[in-house]
A protein has these predicted regions:
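N-terminal non-catalytic cap/leader segment that marks the start of a structured domain
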Residues: 1-54, 62
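Active-site environment of non-heme Fe oxygenases that use a 2-His-1-carboxylate facial triad
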Residues: 29-39, 44-50, 59-249
Length: 249
């Protein structure tokens, strides 16, 4: 596999690709093949905490792909955490807490510039996805959404729950996330976040990249992150998001 055919390869497992992330650069003139890394880390280390890709979004990909053109000489490992194992490790009080109601992600999205200057004011956001509400502000050219989604996901073929979300991510890397709370508006206790992080560290796996490596990640079961690497590194990792896999009819 290489940069020129990885998209075609991933297409064999894909029913529909996810819409592109406009923060990332496109490759091979494709809106679905993107550079994985972008410099938004405020402390300039370019590390990233564990998260399920776009778990706060109206479109939550089923599969995330990574392809390595050039590994970093030092650092830059991709971290992985099995959400099923993490859920099993959490104490009962946390399980009861996250089972009782969904999370609420408050999202603000900068929209691409449009040539349609006739639209004014606000317009309701229409979606077929349960738990999504909000509106478009055409004068600000932004979308404001509230996304209700449980912190756990039922992995049907295994009859298990996976703890996969954005709760322990470094959310300064996600400027569109303005707040995360419970659906009721209740703030999530810092103590709970601390416990989740500690338990995730017990089972975290680090993938050391080699040229032409491919990772195909079940995004609703596994969370992933990235270890620190130098901004001057020639690390070149590409990413693709499969919104809906081809495994289902």
């Amino acid at each position: 596999l290489n940069e020129s055919n990885i998209l075609e390869f991933s297409g064999g497992f894909t029913g529909r690709f996810a819409n592109p992330d406009n923060r990332r650069r496109k490759r091979m003139d494709s809106k679905f093949l993107l550079e994985a890394d972008y410099w938004s880390d405020l402390n300039n280390r370019n590390s990233m905490g564990l998260h399920s890709e776009a778990s706060f979004s109206s479109v939550w990909p089923e599969i995330v792909w990574f392809f390595c053109n050039t590994p970093s000489k030092k650092g830059g490992e991709t971290t992985l955490c099995d959400g099923i194992q993490l859920w099993k490790l959490l104490p009962a009080k946390l399980k009861l807490y996250f089972l009782k109601q969904p999370l609420k992600y408050s999202i603000e999205i900068q929209l691409p510039k449009t040539k349609n200057y006739k639209k004014k004011g606000k317009q309701d956001w229409i979606t077929n996805t349960l738990g999504i509400s909000g509106y478009l502000d055409w004068e600000e050219n932004k979308a404001y959404l509230e996304v209700l989604r449980y912190a756990i996901y039922k992995v049907e073929n295994l009859d298990s729950y996976a703890f996969t979300n954005h709760l322990i991510a470094d959310n300064y890397n996600e400027p569109q996330i303005k707040n995360i709370s419970m659906a009721s508006g209740e703030a999530i206790p810092d103590e709970y976040i601390k416990i989740i992080k500690e338990k995730s560290f017990e089972i975290i796996y680090e993938h050391n990249w080699e040229k032409n490596d491919v990772l195909m990640i079940d995004n609703k079961r596994f969370m992933h992150g990235r270890k620190e690497f130098s901004k001057n590194s020639d690390r070149d990792i590409l990413t693709i998001q499969t919104e809906r896999s081809a495994f289902k009819g």
